[in-house]
Amino acid sequence: MSLLTEVETPTRNEWECKCSDSSDPLVVAASIIGILHLILWILDRLFFKCIYRRLKYGLKRGPSTEGVPESMREEYRQEQQSAVDVDDGHFVNIELE
């Protein structure tokens, strides 16, 4: 007797999906949420540098200058730069003994 005759092969019915209530609204909603979660996770991993850099630094740019005349923009830049510039005479040299 051959060994091949003793081996059982799976029938087609065993490989089919056994979920009879896959049209249940809860199952459909869970599937949609799962797919959306996967898509968002992939996008997050692909663009995380852009997204988090925009959130971290994009909100700290200061007031928008859209619609402001160029002369006022230049004046604002000069005020900001003068606030940053420091005269060397203001520093105090402290020597520790």
From Swiss-Prot:
Site (Seems to be involved in pH gating): W41
Location of this chain's protein in the cell: Virion membrane; Host apical cell membrane
Activity regulation: The M2 protein from most influenza A strains is inhibited by amantadine and rimantadine, resulting in viral uncoating incapacity. Emergence of amantadine-resistant variants is usually rapid.
InterPro entries according to UniProt: Flu_M2
Sequence ranges on the Virion surface membrane side: 1-22
Region (Disordered): 60-83
Predominant location category: virion
Lipid attachment site numbers (S-palmitoyl cysteine): C50
One GO CC term, this protein: membrane
Function: Forms a proton-selective ion channel that is necessary for the efficient release of the viral genome during virus entry. After attaching to the cell surface, the virion enters the cell by endocytosis. Acidification of the endosome triggers M2 ion channel activity.
Quaternary organization: Homotetramer; composed of two disulfide-linked dimers held together by non-covalent interactions. May interact with matrix protein 1.
Protein name: Matrix protein 2
Lineage: Viruses, Riboviria, Orthornavirae, Negarnaviricota, Polyploviricotina
